[in-house]
Swiss-Prot record:
Belongs to the ABC transporter superfamily. Lipid exporter (TC 3.A.1.106) family. This is ATP-dependent lipid A-core flippase. GO terms for cellular component: plasma membrane. The keyword Manganese does not apply. ATP binds at G386, P387, S388, G389, S390, G391, K392, T393. It catalyses: ATP + H2O + lipid A-core oligosaccharideSide 1 = ADP + phosphate + lipid A-core oligosaccharideSide 2. It comes from Burkholderia lata (strain ATCC 17760 / DSM 23089 / LMG 22485 / NCIMB 9086 / R18194 / 383). It is a multi-pass membrane protein. CDD domains: ABC_6TM_MsbA_like. Involved in lipopolysaccharide (LPS) biosynthesis. Translocates lipid A-core from the inner to the outer leaflet of the inner membrane. Transmembrane domains (TMD) form a pore in the inner membrane and the ATP-binding domain (NBD) is responsible for energy generation. NCBIfam families: MsbA_lipidA. PROSITE patterns: ABC_TM1F, ABC_TRANSPORTER_1, ABC_TRANSPORTER_2, MSBA. Homodimer.
Length: 593
């Protein structure tokens, strides 16, 4: 299935143009404008030296050869060539260094802004975008802007100045012949405009396919166990091959479109050169030009072709850069999640109320949650039960404001959550997700995630989570690296490490989505004991899957189709004989089996 890239958006109402991209980049360039001007000046020196080479040929050929040649011309011309090469080399090095300094500074700032904006976007962003799209934007696509800032700018500035200097010298040598050379320029401009539009469309589609190819790799790596157990290697290989072939097709179409410009440009230049030679021969017969003047003119004309070719070739990377800019600034312009009303919350009592809360994702036929109302007293444990798709996860996601309700209000300590500063609100909550998330860092850093690790507190949290002995047996103890998402730990150890992280935070409100994965009896016992310690004295909302957790809850809310259909203690709901009793009976039979 193809993914739709919603990050890439035109940067103005009519599309993306180089001027639009430059306007967006200007705030990043402005603090470095002095260095940019210096780089442009050094590129101007490089361009001027290009015209100096044919300028030295004319006196050498006219006055340096033969028995009547000038002695001074025989010596000053070679020395001037050496001096010219030295000036050119120093200027070229300086311009490259200065431009790379500027572009890398801007690259760093763009990348930091993109990552910061990603961190502060709402949960809907992460549901909408694939990880591969975001990774490509932050890590890879931003380098296209680097290419534009260096290679493209060098071409546009240095080669444009080179063409101007050479055309000026050509006009000085022979204005009639120069007018013939100038005839090819409109033809080249017409070619560029025709190829430009097609290249931009192909680049946009090529980058979309690249993201989809990355997504296939991401899915295959993340689900390698399923792939292997279900013998899905052939299916994944076919999927990857088909997408790679489509990507190759677009790459070749880009090559065909981009490659037409150079030979057509050279053909037009060859026609102009043939006409110039013909006219120059006629002029020489009438003593209107010299050998040195003719050679200098032809040399200058040939030297013009190379920078012109570079200016034509710059179109392809320029289009790639503009397409990348749409993705980069699409992420930077992504709206940040609301930060709340700014009200502080130093220490919550743990008093929670859902008041006629309705929520829908926009595309569903019915609300995901429909007029949900309940209260949770400080220290009370509420278990959420119900069939899959009943709205349990959505309900707990509203409390830390991953999403805001469509209607109704959620209150903490009698105050709507929207009135609190968002960071202050979330600082009062700990979450243990069903899908355990660990970071490729040490055990201590994972336990104290978001804070500077206090090793004594980390050790206490590990002991409370029944993980201290296992960590002590590891070679590096608290400094043991857990690997990507804790791959070096067992399933039970990963769950207990996530519990230790919640214990370390010591927040008064706990959101717990119990893992459904089965563990061996010993690991299950350790995890259950750790959960009981974690929930002590905390207001707890738990999506319960274990019978033992459900049974010890102070109150159970049973959801179905986004509504609370039953409420009460375990014994009360069993006696009622409704949906909860039915679900309990099924789960009990499964566990007994």
């Amino acid at each position: 299935m193809e993914t739709q890239n919603t990050l890439r958006k035109p940067m103005d109402g009519t599309g993306t143009s180089p001027v639009t991209v430059l306007k967006r980049l200007w705030p990043y360039i402005r603090p470095l404008i002095g260095i940019v001007v210096l780089a442009v000046m050094t590129m101007g020196v490089v361009a001027a030296t290009e015209a100096g080479i044919p300028a030295l040929l004319k006196p050498l050929l006219d006055h340096g050869f033969g028995s009547h040649g000038s002695d001074s011309a025989k010596w000053y011309v070679p020395m001037a060539v050496i001096g010219l090469a030295l000036v050119r080399g120093v200027s070229q090095y300086a311009s490259n260094y200065l431009l790379n300094y500027v572009s890398n500074r801007i690259l760093l700032q763009l990348r930091l802004e993109m990552f910061q904006r990603m961190l502060h976007t709402g949960a809907s962003f992460f549901q909408r975008e694939t990880a591969s799209t975001v990774i490509n934007a932050i890590v890879f696509e931003v380098n296209q802007i680097l290419s534009v800032l260096t290679g493209v700018m060098v071409t546009l500035v240095r080669d444009s100045l080179t063409v101007i200097f050479l055309l000026g010298y050509l006009f000085y040598l022979n204005w009639r012949l120069t007018l013939i050379v100038a005839v090819i320029l409109p033809g080249i401009g017409w070619l560029v405009s025709k190829i430009n539009r097609r290249l931009r469309r192909l680049n946009r589609e090529h980058q979309t396919l690249t993201n989809e190819l990355s997504y296939i790799v991401e899915e295959t790596v993340g689900g390698y166990k399923v792939v292997k157990v279900h013998n899905g290697e052939a299916y994944e290989m076919d999927r990857f091959t088909q997408m790679s072939k489509r990507l190759r097709g677009y790459a070749m179409r880009m090559t065909i479109s981009g490659g037409l410009a150079q030979p057509l440009t050279q053909f037009l230049a060859s026609i102009a050169l043939a006409v110039v030679i013909t006219i120059a021969v006629v002029q020489s017969s009438n003593d209107q030009t010299t050998v040195g003047g003719f050679v200098a003119f032809v040399t200058s004309m040939l030297l013009v072709i190379s920078p012109l070719k570079h200016l034509i070739d710059v179109n392809q990377p320029l289009q790639r850069g503009m397409t990348a800019a749409e993705l980069i600034f699409g992420l930077i312009d992504e709206p940040a999640e609301p930060q709340g009303g700014g009200r502080p919350l130093a220490q919550s009592r743990g008093d929670i109320e859902f008041r006629n809360v309705t929520f829908d994702y926009g595309a569903a036929e019915r609300p995901t949650l429909d007029r949900i109302s309940f209260k949770v007293a400080p220290g009370e444990m509420i278990a959420l039960a119900g069939p899959s798709g009943s709205g349990k996860t959505t309900l707990v996601n509203l409390l830390p404001r991953f999403f805001d309700p469509t209607d109704g209000a959620i209150l903490v300590d009698g105050v709507p959550v929207a009135d609190y500063d968002l960071h202050a609100l979330r600082s009062q909550m700990a979450m243990v997700s069903q899908d355990v998330v660990l970071f490729n860092d040490t055990i201590a850093a994972n336990v104290a995630y978001g804070q500077t690790p206090d090793r004594a507190r980390v050790q206490a949290a590990l002991e409370a989570a029944n993980l201290a002995d296992a960590v002590a047996a590891m070679p590096d103890g608290l400094d043991t690296l857990v690997g990507g998402n804790g791959m070096r730990l067992s399933g039970g150890q990963r769950q207990r490490l996530a519990i230790a992280r919640a214990i370390y935070k010591d927040a008064p409100i706990l959101i717990l989505d119990e893992a459904t994965s089965a563990l061996d009896s010993e690991s299950e016992r350790h995890v259950q004991a750790a959960l009981e310690r974690l929930m002590e004295g905390r207001t707890t909302l738990v999506i319960a899957h274990r019978l033992s957790t459900i049974e010890r809850a102070d109150r159970i809310l049973v959801l179905e189709a986004g509504k609370i259909v039953e409420e009460g203690s375990h014994d009360e709901l069993l006696r009622h004989g409704g949906l909860y009793a039915h679900l309990h009976r099924i789960q009990y039979q499964q566990q007994a089996a």
